[in-house]
């Protein structure tokens, strides 16, 4: 893997990319003197600006003072050169004067790619360079610069005035003209522009404010030196990594704070997000957000250049994580106005003086006047631009929440004593702003979640398809235009890609945090969604729900929304009383996350290499001291210190130290690991450095990891397809894909049955017309269920979570005329005339279902007869042509309910519902005499009941309590690899729902699903720990779950945040076991890997306490007992000291392979199972040399796992039951060493077992079934 030669290492840049001084040229100033003498200052008020000086890092070179041990490969990559002749005789690499490029004194200066020096003067003086007769106040404004690749850099410009006096010597210290009285009354503007890769608007404004105090006092020939010194300081300040650590630097006289981004997915927010709320009413804010969401051509106007960029950036920040991807030029100078004629979407800004000119000349623009708080459209475009309204309920909630904000710091600070310290007062204001920013981000994110929450219901993740047509059907009529425009944007397309890629960004986190219990339950359902009775009732009760789907009444304009007792402008003065609307939008109580400050050491002489190295040394020392003071629970903060220290070691040329610091990020926060920088660092190392790194175990693994991951072929950025009906004939595989894309059903096995039904009696392919008819039938049934109008009295008879799935036509029954309705639980009659409710039967109580006929005059009318257990009278309904279908459907639901009750598995009812609805659609599609016979192919449970009725054994039924399906919603079941139960606890750091007990379920490829064990609903739907098989899980302390993987990594999951941001990479082969002491709060965890390595870890610090290597490989698991580590290998069980000395060996009596073992200290027993045999062996711990006692497991073909529960051993495997192979559990009585119970657990092998507080045992099945069973412990 060694590189043939060290490569150039481009070091990460600091805050500064470029610093420039701009103003009028020397020739212009000479002319100004002459004009001013003749005509006065007013006649010479306008000059042409240009770049006078450019300062680009690095400001010190290796030649100035080489650091011992620094790699010769270190250096800055050159991006673009700018050549100018200089008037000074001495060459300086950090500075350039634009001018004549001819002559021998020209040089190269590296200019950042996103900075166009030709356009920079116009942007730094967007109005003009105006000479003044008296000094003016300093003026700061902000720029966003974009290169041809779309990469943005950010500029902060400070304009200041200097007198044009008699010894003007700005360039080289020489006087150029004679003193004059008039020139002394001239004040000429100059600008200093700082360009950074990071949008530190407030921070860089503070820095420039400090610089201006020096520039005003210095002499002309000293200006460049001051700016150069200032630029060098900024270039040495690193950008803080994402997270809670902010950096603070003493710029004198101000302490300047550089905030970090909240997380790697979030932008840096260093501006006052409430500025738009001071300038626009909330309704206008929504309108502007809509313009951005629909990607209009937008132009901001203001008489204050500074507000243009700040306002545009605020609105873009409001829409995070959605991103504006088009042209973004917040400031246009007068010479750039033709930019607004661009035909594509853009967001630009102009001075208010140009408002009328732009309005008249350009068509189709949205014009936003910041000064007057108005939003209008340019000429002759009112008919062309249709700015739709945000959905009404979301708009009302947003407005109420915005009006509840306190937008004035004076109100917050009124009760505080006056600050006598400048920086203390600034810190107070900053804390207030941080809290307000957090609330505003929360409000806008809630708006986005409300707008797009249900998009996920119409996504197919397997084939990356979005069914926009069906999504639009679920939107209210008045919201159609809004969604149609939004769905057609690049912004929304990128949002869809992020959802399909499973990105856990701010949107996904809030969606998860705010989902209702019903949403959590819905995620576990495999049957199609329908509105519940409770939702139907609330739809009727609430007048706000008049906007529900398929309404024909249009929405009112957003501007017309009236909210009682909420005056629009008062919101910025005080907290509003929102008691009237509290039920729908309570006042937010958002607490920003805790942040920490780290003070950067002073940089005394930033242009001297030795002083710069001393600064790096001081910085490293301060970081190391801060790290030493941290407690074991401060891993997030520790990670930031490691990151910064790693960067500083790179600057010092200490590559090995840098890599060791970056390697520590695996144990503290892998989320900020700079993989690309580490890879480039390794590539830049000399042969000797690389060899030294390879000799360090931690770095050897780090290098392998980074190069392996980067060696993988980059995944294609798969586009999102919009669902379309097929246009060609489909074979089985294509049909499966199309049905999954449509969102009708995902389970491939069910789709295979559907294929057989639709092709019954025909060639085994489906034509486009049949598919279209089937899809239409399905969607029409879905729409009918959405529009069912149920009488109010019905709510008293049905459960709140029941849904009406099917309604018959109006029929005559022996209990009245009406429509038969089917829910997942029962059949009932909706009587006509006077609306009423007559219960027919619950599926549990059905005793018999018959399809017969009754005579009427000369006709035989098909009739459905249903007999129930509790009632003597048989229900009869003259269903006529619908009779055969209802007969099939009722029998399938009855069979599904019986299976659900027998197996304690509600998923059977959900699957029966899916089968029933598919039957209905098949009959509606085929409309032929054979349609019913074709539909019967889908009556899976009824057919199974007829062909091979299997009674659940009594012992199994009595012990089994419940079953859950972690693979619900997947295309096929997945094997359960490992289960872990963690008890609930009420921790101040946890939300109430987080305090519930949890069940952690590891599926294939590193997927982990977390269930709330108090309700068995999904708590966290599938996150990843690597991409390999999970072998073991254990709980450490109360907030960590450790996961051992086949890829040799231990992943650590934070229980509070449900994130996996730590990894232990010390093992070199698959991690096979994790063990903790049985104490309440284990301080140590032992891990083992297949190669025989055993490592003891400190849980708090994640440091290795001890490690040893067994001479035997194939280490399968470990257990702790009596200060010894018991190790199970394939061939032996070993008793080992914590130091790694083997004290005892236990061999298999038949030279077979061990599979697992369990220790029972109270009974002084050791139980072991073997691979491929159906016997258990029990040794006495008193004398392991004695031959073991053997127990034979009847009808067992394989043992796969075993656990100890109280005074029992539960053994999982597979064996015969009623002539078929099933997953089985044997419960062993440890005293009698006999089988106490034999449980028929699953359709597939029992793969794993775990105990829940010794009250329940949970078993996980193989891939054929993929379910979890919950068993009561006697």
From Swiss-Prot:
Domain cDENN: 268-400
GO biological process: endosome to lysosome transport; protein catabolic process
Pfam families associated with the record: DENN
GO CC annotations, alphabetized: cytoplasm
SMART domains the UniProt entry points to: dDENN, DENN, WD40
Residue ranges of domain dDENN in the record: 402-506
In-chain residues carrying the UniProt-annotated modification Phosphotyrosine: 940
Tree of life domain: Eukaryota
Biased composition (Basic and acidic residues): 89-105
A GO molecular function held by the record: guanyl-nucleotide exchange factor activity
Modified residues (Phosphoserine): 554, 572
WD repeat residue intervals: 975-1013, 1019-1055, 1059-1099, 1103-1140, 1146-1181, 1186-1228, 1234-1273
Compositional bias segments (type: Basic residues): 76-88
PANTHER family the UniProt entry points to: DENN DOMAIN-CONTAINING PROTEIN 3, DENN DOMAIN-CONTAINING PROTEIN 4
Biological role stated in the UniProt entry: Guanine nucleotide exchange factor (GEF) activating Rab12. Promotes the exchange of GDP to GTP, converting inactive GDP-bound Rab12 into its active GTP-bound form. Regulates autophagy in response to starvation through Rab12 activation. Starvation leads to ULK1/2-dependent phosphorylation of Ser-554 and Ser-572, which in turn allows recruitment of 14-3-3 adapter proteins and leads to up-regulation of GEF activity towards Rab12.
Recorded domain comment: Inactive Dennd3 is found in a closed conformation, in which the linker region interacts with the DENN domain. Phosphorylation of Tyr-940 in the linker region intereferes with this interaction leading to an open conformation and enhances the GEF activity of the protein towards Rab12.
Subunit architecture: Forms oligomers. Interacts with 6 of the 7 known isoforms of 14-3-3 proteins.
Protein name according to UniProt: DENN domain-containing protein 3
Gene that encodes the chain: Dennd3
């Amino acid at each position: 893997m060694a590189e043939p030669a060290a490569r150039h290492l481009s070091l990460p840049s600091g805050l500064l990319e470029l610093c420039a001084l701009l103003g009028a040229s020397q020739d212009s100033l000479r002319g100004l003197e002459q004009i001013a003498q003749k005509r006065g200052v007013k006649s010479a008020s306008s000059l042409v600006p240009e770049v006078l000086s450019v300062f680009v890092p690095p400001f010190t070179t290796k030649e100035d003072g080489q650091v011992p041990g620094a790699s010769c490969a270190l250096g800055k990559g050159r991006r673009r050169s700018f050549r100018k002749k200089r008037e000074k005789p001495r060459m300086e690499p950090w500075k350039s004067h634009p001018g004549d490029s001819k002559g021998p004194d020209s040089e190269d200066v590296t200019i950042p790619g996103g900075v166009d020096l030709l356009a920079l003067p116009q942007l730094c003086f967007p109005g003009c360079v105006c000479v003044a007769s008296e000094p003016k106040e300093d003026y700061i404004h902000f720029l966003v610069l974009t290169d041809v690749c779309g990469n943005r850099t950010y500029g902060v410009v400070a304009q200041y005035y200097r007198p044009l006096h008699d010894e003007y010597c700005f360039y080289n210290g020489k006087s150029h003209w004679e003193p004059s009285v008039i020139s002394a009354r001239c004040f000429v503007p100059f600008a200093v522009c700082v360009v950074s890769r990071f949008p530190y608007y407030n921070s860089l404004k503070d820095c420039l404010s400090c610089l201006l105090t020096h520039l005003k006092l210095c002499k002309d020939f000293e200006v460049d030196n001051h700016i150069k010194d200032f630029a060098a300081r900024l270039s040495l300040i690193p950008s803080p990594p994402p997270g809670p650590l902010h950096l603070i630097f003493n710029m004198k006289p101000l302490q300047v704070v550089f905030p970090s981004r909240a997380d790697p997915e979030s932008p840096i927010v260093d501006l006052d997000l409430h500025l738009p709320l001071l300038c626009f009413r909330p309704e206008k804010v929504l309108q502007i957000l809509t313009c951005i969401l629909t990607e209009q051509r937008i132009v901001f106007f203001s008489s204050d250049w500074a507000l243009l960029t700040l306002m545009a950036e605020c609105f873009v920040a409001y829409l995070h994580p959605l991103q504006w991807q088009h042209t973004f030029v917040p400031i246009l100078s007068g010479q750039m106005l033709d930019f607004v004629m661009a035909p594509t979407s853009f967001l630009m800004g102009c001075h208010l003086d140009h408002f009328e000119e732009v309005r008249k000349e350009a068509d189709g623009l949205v014009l936003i006047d910041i000064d007057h708080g108005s939003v209008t459209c340019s000429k002759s475009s009112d008919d062309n631009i249709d700015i739709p309204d945000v959905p009404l309920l979301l708009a009302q909630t947003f407005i109420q929440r915005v009006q509840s904000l306190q937008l004035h710091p004076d109100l917050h600070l009124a009760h505080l004593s006056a600050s006598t310290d400048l920086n203390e007062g600034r810190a107070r204001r900053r804390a207030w702003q941080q809290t307000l920013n957090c609330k505003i981000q929360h409000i806008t994110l809630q708006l986005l979640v409300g707008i797009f929450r249900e998009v996920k219901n119409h996504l197919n993740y397997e084939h990356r398809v979005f069914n926009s047509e069906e999504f639009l059907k679920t939107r209210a009529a008045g919201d159609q235009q809004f969604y149609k425009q939004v769905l057609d944007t690049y912004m929304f397309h990128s949002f869809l890609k992020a959802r399909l890629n499973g990105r856990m960004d701010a949107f996904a986190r809030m969606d998860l945090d705010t989902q209702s219990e019903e949403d959590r339950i819905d995620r576990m359902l495999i049957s199609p969604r329908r509105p519940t009775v409770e939702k139907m009732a609330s739809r009727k009760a609430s007048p706000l729900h008049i906007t529900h789907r398929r309404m024909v009444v249009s929405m009112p304009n957003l501007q017309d929304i009236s909210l009682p007792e909420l005056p629009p402008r008062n919101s910025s003065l005080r907290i509003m009383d929102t008691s009237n609307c509290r039920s729908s939008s309570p006042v937010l109580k958002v607490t920003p996350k805790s942040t920490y400050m780290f003070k950067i050491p002073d940089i005394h002489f930033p242009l001297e290499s030795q002083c710069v190295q001393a600064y790096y040394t001081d910085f490293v020392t301060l970081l190391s001291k801060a790290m030493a003071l941290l407690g074991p629970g401060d891993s997030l903060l520790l990670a930031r210190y490691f990151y910064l220290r790693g960067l500083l070691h790179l600057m010092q040329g200490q590559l090995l130290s840098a890599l060791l610091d970056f390697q520590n990020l695996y144990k503290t926060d892998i989320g900020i690991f700079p993989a690309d920088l580490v890879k480039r660092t390794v590539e830049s190392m000399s042969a000797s450095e690389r060899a030294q790194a390879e000799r360090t175990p931690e770095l050897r693994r780090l290098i392998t990891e980074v190069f392996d991951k980067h060696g993988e072929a980059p995944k294609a950025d798969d586009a999102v397809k919009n669902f379309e009906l097929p246009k060609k004939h489909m074979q089985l595989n294509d049909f499966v894909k199309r049905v999954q894309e449509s969102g009708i059903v995902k389970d491939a096995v069910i789709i295979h049955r559907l294929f057989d039904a639709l092709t019954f009696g025909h060639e085994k392919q489906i034509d486009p017309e049949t598919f279209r008819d089937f899809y239409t039938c399905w969607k029409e049934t879905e729409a009918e269920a959405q529009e069912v109008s149920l009488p109010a009295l019905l709510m008293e008879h049905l459960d709140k979570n029941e849904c009406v799935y099917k309604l018959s036509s109006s029929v005559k029954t022996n209990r009245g005329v009406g429509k038969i309705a089917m829910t997942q639980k029962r059949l009932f009659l909706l009587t006509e005339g006077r609306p009423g409710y007559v219960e027919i039967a619950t599926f549990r109580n059905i005793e018999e279902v018959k399809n017969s006929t009754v005579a009427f005059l000369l006709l035989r009318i098909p009739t459905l007869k249903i007999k129930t257990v509790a009632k003597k009278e048989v229900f009869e309904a003259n269903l006529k042509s619908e009779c055969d279908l209802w007969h099939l459907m009722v029998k399938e639901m009855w069979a599904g309910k019986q299976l659900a009750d027998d197996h304690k598995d509600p998923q059977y009812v959900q699957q029966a519902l899916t089968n029933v609805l598919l039957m209905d659609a098949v009959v509606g599609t085929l409309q032929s005499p054979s349609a019913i016979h074709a539909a019967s192919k889908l009556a899976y449970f009824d057919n199974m009941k007829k062909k091979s009725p299997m009674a659940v054994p009594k012992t199994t039924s009595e012990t089994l309590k419940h079953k859950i399906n972690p693979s619900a919603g997947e295309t096929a079941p997945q094997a359960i690899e490992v289960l872990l139960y963690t008890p609930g606890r009420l921790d101040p750091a946890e939300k109430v729902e987080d305090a519930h007990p949890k069940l952690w379920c590891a599926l294939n490829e590193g997927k982990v699903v977390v269930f709330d064990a108090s309700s068995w609903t999904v708590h966290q739907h599938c996150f990843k720990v690597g991409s390999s098989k999970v072998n073991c899980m254990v709980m450490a302390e109360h907030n960590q779950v450790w996961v051992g993987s086949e890829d040799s990594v231990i992943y650590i999951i934070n229980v509070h945040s449900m994130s996996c941001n730590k990894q232990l990479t010390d093992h070199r082969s698959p991690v096979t076991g994790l063990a903790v002491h049985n104490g309440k709060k284990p301080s140590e965890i032992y891990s083992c890997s297949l190669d025989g390595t055993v490592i003891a870890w400190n849980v708090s610090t994640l440091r290795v306490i001890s490690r040893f290597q067994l001479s035997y490989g194939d280490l399968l698991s470990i257990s702790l007992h009596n200060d010894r580590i018991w190790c199970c290998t394939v061939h032996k069980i070993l008793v080992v000291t914590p130091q790694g000395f083997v004290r005892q060996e236990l061999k298999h009596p038949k030279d077979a392979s061990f599979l697992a073992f369990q220790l029972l200290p109270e009974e002084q027993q050791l139980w072991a199972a073997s691979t491929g045999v159906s016997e258990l062996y029990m040794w006495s711990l008193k004398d392991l040399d004695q031959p073991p006692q053997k127990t034979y497991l009847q009808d067992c073909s394989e043992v796969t796992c075993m656990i100890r529960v109280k005074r029992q051993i539960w053994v999982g495997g597979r064996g015969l039951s009623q002539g078929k192979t099933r997953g089985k559990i044997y419960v062993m009585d440890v005293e009698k060493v006999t089988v106490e119970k034999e449980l028929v657990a699953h359709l597939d092998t029992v793969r794993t077992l775990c105990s829940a507080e010794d009250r329940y045992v949970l078993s996980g099945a193989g891939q054929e079934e993929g379910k979890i069973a919950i068993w009561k412990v006697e």
